[in-house]
């Protein structure tokens, strides 16, 4: 089911979307697929699949370790897309590919767009591609998810709105991804600023890890992105792989209950 329909259904039920970020094929392909199935079973609504990259500037310490882990395993954009096709065959979640721009540029925009369509990718996030350059990929017929930050000007917010995206990824704080405390009132004011310009659903990410954070932004954001918190579970249970999917499922269930 594609992203817009899923988000519309959740909005009708007055539920927030739970968007899970997981690095493609880490620790290995089969275990990663088991983890993704567990996330789906636990109530995850959309899946964000990361492509390992050598210089992940937008990512914090935890996710950066997963990028380097994937690079050591020889993972790249082509293998990430091959794995995305396996994910598409294994689960029904709308699938968002998260990739930095340099690997896309090296692959070539035409080939990248075609391979995304072949793999069943529903949308793409490119965190280091400026909003005013997203048109390079939009012209390839891809669904692009723009990212905004609390520092985004009204003109940047309007630029994101003009893309008519399936949703806007609202970075919760200045800086990189990671588990942290969040300035609740500042974030709510920021979301309202975006809401005044765009009718697109808003997904809040960077720092969401606890059920109380999901509860705090219910009614303000249309979805939350969980990444570093899941990555920490994967790190903790890597040596006990039989337990890992179940722990991810439990975390998703706990977060989804409050969405």
From Swiss-Prot:
SUPFAM superfamilies: Ribulose-phoshate binding barrel
Coiled coil stretches, renumbered: none
Catalytic residues, chain numbering: 48, 59
Transmembrane segments: none
EC code: 4.2.1.20
CDD domains: Tryptophan_synthase_alpha
UniProt pathway: Amino-acid biosynthesis; L-tryptophan biosynthesis; L-tryptophan from chorismate: step 5/5
Gene3D superfamilies tied to this protein: Aldolase class I
Keywords: Amino-acid biosynthesis, Aromatic amino acid biosynthesis, Lyase, Tryptophan biosynthesis
Family annotation (InterPro entries): Aldolase_TIM (IPR013785), RibuloseP-bd_barrel (IPR011060), Trp_synthase_alpha_AS (IPR018204), Trp_synthase_suA (IPR002028)
A single cellular component GO annotation: cytosol
Molecular function GO labels: tryptophan synthase activity
Superkingdom in the source lineage: Bacteria
Pfam families associated with the record: Trp_syntA
Annotated catalysed reactions: (1S,2R)-1-C-(indol-3-yl)glycerol 3-phosphate + L-serine = D-glyceraldehyde 3-phosphate + L-tryptophan + H2O
Function of the molecule: The alpha subunit is responsible for the aldol cleavage of indoleglycerol phosphate to indole and glyceraldehyde 3-phosphate.
Family of the protein in this entry: Belongs to the TrpA family.
Quaternary assembly: Tetramer of two alpha and two beta chains.
Protein name, as recorded: Tryptophan synthase alpha chain
Organism: Syntrophomonas wolfei subsp. wolfei (strain DSM 2245B / Goettingen)
């Amino acid at each position: 089911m594609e992203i817009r329909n899923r988000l519309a259904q959740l909005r009708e039920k007055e539920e927030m979307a739970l968007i899970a970020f997981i690095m493609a094929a880490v620790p290995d392909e089969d275990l990663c697929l088991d983890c993704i199935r567990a996330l789906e079973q636990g109530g995850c609504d959309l899946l964000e699949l990361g492509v390992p990259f050598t210089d992940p500037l937008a990512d914090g310490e935890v996710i950066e370790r997963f990028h380097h882990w994937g690079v050591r395993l020889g993972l790249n954009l082509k293998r990430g897309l091959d794995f995305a096709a396996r994910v598409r065959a294994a689960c029904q979640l709308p699938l968002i590919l998260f990739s930095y721009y340099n690997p896309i540029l090296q692959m070539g925009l035409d080939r990248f767009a075609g391979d995304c369509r072949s793999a069943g990718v529903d949308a793409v996030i490119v965190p280091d591609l400026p909003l005013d350059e997203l048109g390079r990929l939009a012209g390839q017929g891809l669904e692009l998810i723009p990212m905004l930050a609390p520092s985004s000007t009204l003109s940047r917010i309007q630029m994101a709105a003009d893309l008519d995206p399936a949703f806007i990824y609202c970075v919760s704080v200045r800086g990189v991804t990671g588990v942290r405390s969040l300035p609740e009132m500042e974030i709510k004011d920021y979301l309202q600023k975006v809401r005044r310009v765009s009718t697109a659903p808003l997904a809040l990410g960077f720092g969401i890890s606890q059920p109380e954070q999901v509860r705090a932004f219910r009614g303000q954001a249309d979805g939350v992105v969980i990444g570093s918190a899941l990555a920490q579970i994967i790190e903790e249970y890597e040596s006990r792989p039989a337990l890992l999917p179940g722990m991810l499922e439990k975390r998703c269930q706990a977060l989804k209950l409050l969405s």
